[in-house]
A protein has these predicted regions:
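Membrane-interface transmembrane helices that cradle and orient dolichyl/undecaprenyl
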Residues: 136-152, 181-185
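Perimembrane helix-loop-helix junctions
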Residues: 2-4, 141, 169-207
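Transmembrane and membrane-interface helices of multi-pass
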Residues: 106-118, 132, 136
Length: 227
């Protein structure tokens, strides 16, 4: 209890700053693993988004994180740009958790310096940080007093295009959205006609992307090593 009391005397803002400082040092000292470098090279060698889409297909991962990596290569053709992008997304996730989560102060601090937020979702340049950020955003949206079906639908669509682990979570948010929609009794209480039009457009684009992605996966020939 004495240790917990001493920790509680330090402001959460200070702990967040400490988290940011330690993780940015870790980013600069981290040597990319093979799977991280593979994702970087795929994005770097792609001449356009369509080529990126085709080159990413054999990995089996959705396109969102490779697209962010591709944007990072346009900013600076050095892997550090991807690592800084990863750090920025992790920093935003950490801020949202510290600022808006309902947990006790000590629990927030322990979470920040836990294995996943500190190492796996921050120092390793992989898809998981986008998954973390979208989950936090989705949790904020579904618990908000002013429920936004449009924003929640966007989060669900992005989760489906992030990682296989996000599909179950996306379905959870989708069920919450359907429940909230049914509880309203009248769709006009949740969304305007303009928003409904945008939802239809986003839904069509989303399903087109799914079809194109899986067509690219099916048409990609993976070379088998000869023995």
């Amino acid at each position: 209890m004495l240790f917990a009391n001493k920790i509680s005397l330090i402001r959460l803002r200070t702990w967040l700053i400490l988290y940011l400082v330690l993780t940015i040092i870790g980013v600069y000292r981290h040597v990319l693993w093979r799977d991280e470098m593979q994702g970087w090279l795929v994005a770097l060698q792609s001449q356009n988004i369509f080529e990126l889409w085709s080159a990413n297909a054999p990995s089996g991962h959705p396109i969102l994180y490779p697209l962010l990596t591709y944007i990072a290569t346009l900013i600076h053709p050095n892997p550090i740009s991807m690592q800084l992008m990863q750090w920025l997304l992790a920093a935003i996730s950490a801020f949202l958790f510290v600022r808006y989560s309902p947990f006790a102060k000590l629990h927030k601090i322990l979470f920040l310096f836990g294995y996943f937020p500190f190492w796996e979702y921050c120092l390793l340049s992989r898809h998981y940080v986008v998954l973390e950020l979208l989950v936090f955003c989705g949790a904020m949206l579904v618990t908000s007093k002013e429920f936004s079906l449009l924003l929640t639908s966007i989060v669900v669509a992005l989760l489906f295009n992030t990682h296989a682990l996000g599909w179950g979570i996306a379905n959870g948010f989708l069920c919450v959205s359907v429940f909230a929609f049914s509880q309203a009794g009248n769709s006009r209480k949740l969304i305007s006609s303009t928003q409904r039009s945008w939802i239809k457009i986003c839904a069509v684009i989303f399903y087109i992307l799914i079809v194109v992605y899986y067509v690219a996966v099916c048409n990609t020939q993976v070379t088998q090593p000869t023995t």
